A protein has these predicted regions:
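N-terminal pre-Walker A segment at the start of P-loop NTPase domains
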Residues: 1-29
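Hydrophobic anchor at the beta1->P-loop junction of P-loop NTPases
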Residues: 40
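Conserved nucleotide-sensing/catalytic segment adjacent to the nucleotide-binding pocket
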Residues: 77-153
Length: 284
């Protein structure tokens, strides 16, 4: 018989102070309750990133004291950059941070590790945004995933932290992260008919229990096919303008500005004959 079994018992005793603390937390509007890893997946142009931004804004509005940490350039906030320096990051965290109008920006894998290690906000919470998560930790490289990734993923609730990530295919994410994901959102965007829209403007998303999603070798979903819930929204111009929609996610060492798609690296000669629009199509 295992030596631990004699310690198994049935106890109805409870701590009154623990119950009081739980009640205080429930009544505290600043107490950050969202937690875990929430994944948004879909093909290019299906609206996974804008759906993530849609959710992040709702959470940030509800919890204005939460610190936002993002590898997406958020245009409606001031970026606090530390350029891979632990000392700079600690300097940022040592000062008072305006959580409503600023955010901590990271890009490289090293910077991602530092923000996971250092950024804590107590009961007010942390919102971590990671676009194209498979670029950091892919399922193709599962054996080389550092232990801290698993450690941090397993302790999001304790640290009052929610991690919003995107991936083109859910099964591209490293297995250790998929196992600790809570909800996986399948995203799909559509353009309005009759030439009223030049691109996707209406987005639908389906919420699945992430742990139940299974895929075959071709990436086709074979299990977990019944969504818990479905939602949708129209993409507003304000939502699109709140982040850099052309940004390229790069996780390695980078020269200043090279990998920011919003910064042109070429100069295009002006056309002698401007394009004209005929029946919704531009042509010369």
């Amino acid at each position: 018989m295992p030596n631990i079994l004699p310690f198994v018992s049935k106890s109805l005793s409870f701590d009154k102070e623990a119950i009081r603390e739980n009640r205080r937390n429930l009544k505290d509007p600043d107490y950050f309750r969202p937690s875990g890893i929430q994944t948004f997946f879909g093909e290019q142009g299906d609206g996974k990133t804008i759906t993530l931004i849609h959710f992040y804004k709702k959470i940030a509005k509800r919890y204005p004291k939460a610190i936002v940490v993002s590898n997406i350039i958020l245009k409606d906030r001031t970026a606090l950059k530390f350029d891979g320096s632990l000392d700079k990051l600690k300097s940022i965290l040592s000062r008072e941070i305006d959580t409503v109008s600023s955010y901590i920006y990271y890009s490289s894998l090293e910077e991602y590790a530092l923000v996971n290690q250092c950024v804590r906000n107590g009961k007010y919470g942390v919102i971590i945004i990671t676009d194209e998560y498979q670029n950091y930790f892919s399922n193709q490289d599962s054996r080389n995933v550092p232990p801290w990734v698993i450690h941090q993923a397993a302790q999001n609730r304790k640290q009052k932290r929610i991690h919003l990530v995107t991936s083109q295919d859910y099964d591209q994410l490293v297995k250790a992260v998929r196992r600790r994901s809570d909800i996986a959102f399948k995203c799909k965007s559509f353009a309005l008919p009759f030439g009223l829209s030049a691109g996707p403007i209406f987005t639908i998303y389906w919420a699945f229990i992430a742990k139940k999603l299974e895929f075959d070798n071709n990436g086709k979903r074979v299990d977990g096919s019944r969504p818990l819930k479905m939602g949708f929204f129209f993409q507003s111009q304000a939502l699109r303008d709140s982040y850099d929609t052309n940004q390229v996610v790069f996780t390695g060492s980078q020269a200043d500005g090279i990998y920011l798609a919003s910064q042109p690296t070429v100069t295009v000669k002006k056309l002698a004959v401007p394009l004209k629009r005929r029946k919704g199509v531009f042509s010369r």
